[in-house]
């Protein structure tokens, strides 16, 4: 047994969708989460800047003696995951390959849509991974740069959010049977997205799919947390104001959590 925590990094609050799924599937694991909300969104930023910020988050998590790092951010995964994975001697997971694999299994007509930040979409990484595994699948990608600010400002139920989602996703309506939510912020807009595309379109949460891989690696490396750990405690950190982060996190995780502000 290994009672060290699992480290999660994201550009802000979006990675909490991955944490929520981990708490459901692996409730005995401890969590350290760092959200860089002060510099969110990452999507419009240059790749080199995203790489620099990601390494700062990684180094922060390493000071917390984590046993594994999860890139709970598609943009950071697209830009820096391979590099970080090769550099560290602990397991490092990203969210893109699990999401791509799940989309291939889910599609009924071979028409998959991918939505994400500008950087994730321009990298072409989802299309590359999907067509590497399933060359006949048709992939339609769409950048949704206005989605992350909606989530970070906790306006996911507002009329403005509905208007933006409807306008942005209009090009995909009637053209896909499966949609990858290629940003961990997007599941927080899941209800609106489903309403726009219709109930026939299957939505793939790349972060939730990633948790299945976390479980596999914990078993493979024999680093599962103890179910009898009486000192299990989660820690959440943000580079922005802790009040806003705490409100979003407590609502999404359905429990009151403590959030600490950090400067990287």
From Swiss-Prot:
Q: Which UniProt keywords apply?
A: Cell shape, Cell wall biogenesis/degradation, Isomerase, Peptidoglycan synthesis
Which Pfam families did the record assign? Answer: Asp_Glu_race
Q: Which residues form the active site?
A: 73, 183
Q: Which GO terms describe its molecular function?
A: glutamate racemase activity
Entry's Gene Ontology BP terms: cell wall organization; peptidoglycan biosynthetic process; regulation of cell shape
Q: Name the positions where substrate binds.
A: 10-11, 42-43, 74-75, 184-185
The record's similarity note reads: Belongs to the aspartate/glutamate racemases family.
Q: Which purpose does this protein serve, as stated in its record?
A: Provides the (R)-glutamate required for cell wall biosynthesis.
User: HAMAP family recorded for this chain?
Assistant: Glu_racemase
Name used for this protein in its record: Glutamate racemase
């Amino acid at each position: 047994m290994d009672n060290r925590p699992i480290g999660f990094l994201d550009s802000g609050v979006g990675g909490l969708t991955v944490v929520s799924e981990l708490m459901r599937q692996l409730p005995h694991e401890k969590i350290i989460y760092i959200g860089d909300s002060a510099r969110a969104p990452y999507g419009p930023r240059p790749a080199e800047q995203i790489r620099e910020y990601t390494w700062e988050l990684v180094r922060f998590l390493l000071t917390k003696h984590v046993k594994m790092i999860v890139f709970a951010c598609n943009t950071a995964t697209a830009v820096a995951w391979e590099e970080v994975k090769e550099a560290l001697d602990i397991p490092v997971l990203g969210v893109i390959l699990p999401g791509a694999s799940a989309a291939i299994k889910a599609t009924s007509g071979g028409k998959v849509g991918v939505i994400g930040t500008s950087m994730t979409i321009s990298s072409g990484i989802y299309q590359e991974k999907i067509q590497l595994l399933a060359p006949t699948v048709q992939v339609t990608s769409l950048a949704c740069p206005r989605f992350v600010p909606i989530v970070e400002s906790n306006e996911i139920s507002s009329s403005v959010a509905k208007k933006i989602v409807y306008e942005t996703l209009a090009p995909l309506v009637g053209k896909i049977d499966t949609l990858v939510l290629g940003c961990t912020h997007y599941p927080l807009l899941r209800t609106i997205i489903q309403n726009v595309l219709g109930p026939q379109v299957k939505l793939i949460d790349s972060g939730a799919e990633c948790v299945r891989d976390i479980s596999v690696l914990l078993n493979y490396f024999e680093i599962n947390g103890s179910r009898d750990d009486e000192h299990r405690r989660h820690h959440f950190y943000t580079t922005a104001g802790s009040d806003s982060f705490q409100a979003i996190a407590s609502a999404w995780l359905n429990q009151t959590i403590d959030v600490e502000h950090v400067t990287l």
